[in-house]
Amino acid sequence: MAESGSGTSGGSSSVGGVSNPASLAPGDSQLIALIVEQLKSRGQFDGFRRDCLADVDTKPAYQNLRQKVDNFVSTHLDKQEWNADMNKNQLRNGLRQSVIQSGMLEAGVDRIISQVVDPKLNHIFRPQIEKAIHEYLTAQTKEDSAPPLPPGPPEPQEQEPPEPSQSVS
């Protein structure tokens, strides 16, 4: 899934031709895209995901949601009269739609986020994101303010060798 600004390598990148990200206003979509790409390239989003997943199954909201879904599925399947001609895919899709339409997933996921993600947001994730942003903008500012390299020695110009003079004696 490529996003704008992806595929850049090294320290200098630009989205939409932005040469100095520090000059963009906070909240600018180009600046956000640059920062998100920087966080992705550092693997920080993967770290956040792993950190949250390590905690999720210990939280009451997850255990409660899992129990609700298990009960819902059992009740739904108990209402079905099984026969050999049943289409398992249709049954599975119908069950999936019923779970989604019940609204229990949305409410349960919101509770999981409030128990798992929210506590980490200000104390773990925000400081790491702010540090990455600061390092990125500092590196970009240094690149932009670095003095230009002095010109190298002039390249030799190719000249045709002089023709031998013909002297008549």
UniProtKB/Swiss-Prot annotation:
Disulfide bonds: none annotated. GO terms for cellular component: centrosome; cytoplasm; kinetochore. It comes from the Eukaryota. Residues 1-22, 137-169 are annotated as: Disordered. InterPro entries: BOD1/SHG1_dom, BOD1L1. This is Biorientation of chromosomes in cell division protein 1. GO terms for biological process: cell division. The gene is bod1.
